[in-house]
């Protein structure tokens, strides 16, 4: 039972890539081929002796092709257990011939609904019924039936047939059957997600049902710690199709670890805030920025970012918003950096940076999606939310103090605000002249975050006088604002919304500090 010779095949594909060569090869093995609609026409035009499925069903295709393979003669031929005397007797009594191979792919539902001008009628017509039914029947009976959904598998099936006198092995049939059930699950999920989306009346809430398809893209040696198993999975949910290879290309270095991918995601997310801006460099460690700067050149921006914290960048991650030039590469090379992310690398830079074999070099291929769903596992389920893609403009800022911020302060405030969104809460970011000069991350108390930011600035002798401060959430008391003023800050940006806002504003006015509210909180847990 391990090997099963293929005598009769059913081919019906919407993606006709490679189907002619595959069918010709099957014919060379003496396989009898049946087909439907456009596939049948294409096979006959290529000189292949294919027959209509109607010769099996003795029933014409009807209702614009909606009904053609949903027939006992088809599914009996697929589902009959070979070697089962009752099944074989019933098949003979009903003139049902066994079908040994099915090559089917489905109507392009996902591609159809992704079109901006798709109509509901078009979407419905691209819901495949007969295809999934045949695939599931064949996959259920994979001990006897070879089922192919992917043109990439044609060649391996043919090679196995050549090696086994026209037969396939049970191991291969099981492998192909697993692909079928993964495909049909994803296909049904895409239909469900689409129907949820178009019937949703309240856009402020997420759908009641959400189907997510995950496909392993990277095997990892371990997870966050060596005792944890891990892998990276590409994700398909609705129109959101996310995979590492879609957005990034690893050009050099060892395989990426679990922690590497977390850091790449964090660093790329922050540098995306500065797409199209002046040369900007972000240095990350453990998913937090330890230094960010913008300047006239990438090299200057890197050196300013590095000066924020001269210890944390060792073994860190660097992301830039411009093609990486040699001057910046040489500056980066002064210490060990584990990962460098850039949209491009200028001539000679890759070869220069590749001299350190343990360094990972990553090319970012395109912009990250501005709207996407984010998922977070908990001990009892999955949290889902929209991506925090909101930013602030000068026009949206509300000045709440007597003193207006200067133009230079406004630039620094907006710069710091973009950064604090990407720092673990509670977050305080000091910035001056488009450079972070102190970052306080992840503290339970906002005042403690401010103290850490001040202490870090002092460690590297960075001047906080006339700096600006960004806070990811409101100051619950005036003490956070007072701490910033005592450090030398001249302007503050924060969401506002505390019941003690007036106390905080009064404290700012007493110290001649300009303060603006954004009306948006940026917690990051």
From Swiss-Prot:
CDD domains found in the cross-reference section: IMPCH
GO BP terms in the entry: 'de novo' IMP biosynthetic process
SUPFAM superfamilies: Cytidine deaminase-like (SSF53927), Methylglyoxal synthase-like (SSF52335)
Pathway(s) it belongs to: Purine metabolism; IMP biosynthesis via de novo pathway; 5-formamido-1-(5-phospho-D-ribosyl)imidazole-4-carboxamide from 5-amino-1-(5-phospho-D-ribosyl)imidazole-4-carboxamide (10-formyl THF route): step 1/1; Purine metabolism; IMP biosynthesis via de novo pathway; IMP from 5-formamido-1-(5-phospho-D-ribosyl)imidazole-4-carboxamide: step 1/1
GO MF assignments: IMP cyclohydrolase activity; phosphoribosylaminoimidazolecarboxamide formyltransferase activity
Catalysed reactions listed for this entry: (6R)-10-formyltetrahydrofolate + 5-amino-1-(5-phospho-beta-D-ribosyl)imidazole-4-carboxamide = 5-formamido-1-(5-phospho-D-ribosyl)imidazole-4-carboxamide + (6S)-5,6,7,8-tetrahydrofolate; IMP + H2O = 5-formamido-1-(5-phospho-D-ribosyl)imidazole-4-carboxamide
Domain MGS-like, chain residue ranges per copy: 1-149
Domain remark from Swiss-Prot or TrEMBL: The IMP cyclohydrolase activity resides in the N-terminal region.
Family statement: Belongs to the PurH family.
PANTHER family found in the cross-reference section: BIFUNCTIONAL PURINE BIOSYNTHESIS PROTEIN ATIC (PTHR11692:SF0), BIFUNCTIONAL PURINE BIOSYNTHESIS PROTEIN PURH (PTHR11692)
Name this polypeptide is given: Bifunctional purine biosynthesis protein PurH
Organism, as annotated: Chloroherpeton thalassium (strain ATCC 35110 / GB-78)
């Amino acid at each position: 039972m391990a090997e099963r010779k293929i005598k009769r095949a059913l081919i019906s594909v919407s993606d006709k890539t490679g189907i002619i060569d595959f069918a010709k090869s099957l014919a060379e093995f003496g396989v009898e081929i049946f087909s439907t609609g456009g596939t049948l026409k294409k096979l006959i035009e290529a000189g292949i002796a294919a027959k209509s499925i109607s010769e099996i069903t003795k029933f014409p295709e009807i209702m614009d092709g909606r009904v053609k393979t949903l027939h006992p003669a088809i599914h009996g031929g697929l589902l009959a257990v070979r070697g089962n005397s009752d099944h074989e007797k019933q098949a003979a009594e009903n003139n049902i011939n066994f079908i040994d191979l099915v090559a089917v792919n489905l109507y392009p539902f996902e591609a159809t609904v992704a079109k901006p001008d798709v109509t509901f009628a078009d979407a419905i017509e691209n819901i495949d019924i007969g295809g999934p039914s045949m695939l599931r029947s064949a996959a259920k009976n994979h001990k006897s039936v070879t089922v192919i959904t992917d043109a990439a598998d044609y060649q391996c099936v043919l090679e196995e047939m050549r090696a086994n006198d026209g037969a396939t092995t049970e191991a291969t049939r099981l492998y192909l059957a697993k692909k079928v059930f993964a495909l049909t699950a994803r296909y049904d999920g895409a239909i469900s997600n689409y129907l949820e989306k178009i019937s949703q009346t309240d856009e402020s809430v997420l759908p009641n049902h959400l189907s997510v398809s995950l496909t392993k893209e990277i095997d990892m040696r371990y997870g966050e710690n060596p005792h944890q198993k891990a892998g990276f999975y590409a994700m398909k949910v609705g129109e959101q199709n996310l995979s590492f290879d879609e957005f990034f290309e690893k050009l050099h270095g060892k395989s990426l670890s679990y922690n590497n991918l977390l850091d790449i995601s964090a660093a790329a997310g922050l540098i995306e805030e500065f797409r199209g801006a002046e040369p900007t460099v972000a240095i990350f460690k453990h998913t937090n920025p330890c230094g960010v700067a913008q300047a006239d050149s990438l090299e200057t921006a890197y050196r300013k970012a590095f000066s924020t914290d001269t210890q944390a960048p060792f073994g860190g991650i660097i992301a830039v918003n411009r093609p990486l030039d040699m001057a910046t590469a040489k500056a980066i090379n002064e210490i060990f950096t584990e990962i460098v992310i850039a949209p491009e690398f200028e001539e000679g830079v890759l070869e220069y940076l590749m001299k350190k074999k343990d360094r990972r070099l990553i090319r970012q291929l395109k912009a990250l999606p501005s709207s996407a769903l984010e998922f977070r596992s908990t001990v009892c389920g999955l949290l889902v939310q929209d991506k925090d893609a909101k930013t602030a403009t000068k026009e949206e800022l509300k000045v709440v103090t007597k003193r207006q911020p200067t133009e230079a302060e406004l630039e620094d405030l907006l710069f710091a605000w973009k950064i604090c969104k990407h720092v673990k809460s509670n977050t305080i970011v000091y910035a001056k002249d488009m450079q972070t000069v102190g970052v306080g991350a992840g503290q339970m108390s906002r005042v403690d975050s401010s103290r850490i930011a001040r202490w870090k600035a002092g460690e590297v002798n960075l001047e906080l006088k006339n700096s600006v401060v960004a806070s990811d959430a409101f100051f619950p008391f005036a003490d956070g604002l007072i701490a910033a003023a005592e450090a030398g800050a001249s302007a503050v940006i924060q969401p506002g919304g505390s019941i003690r806002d007036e106390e905080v504003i009064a404290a700012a006015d007493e110290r001649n500090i300009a303060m603006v509210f954004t009306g948006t909180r940026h917690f990051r847990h």
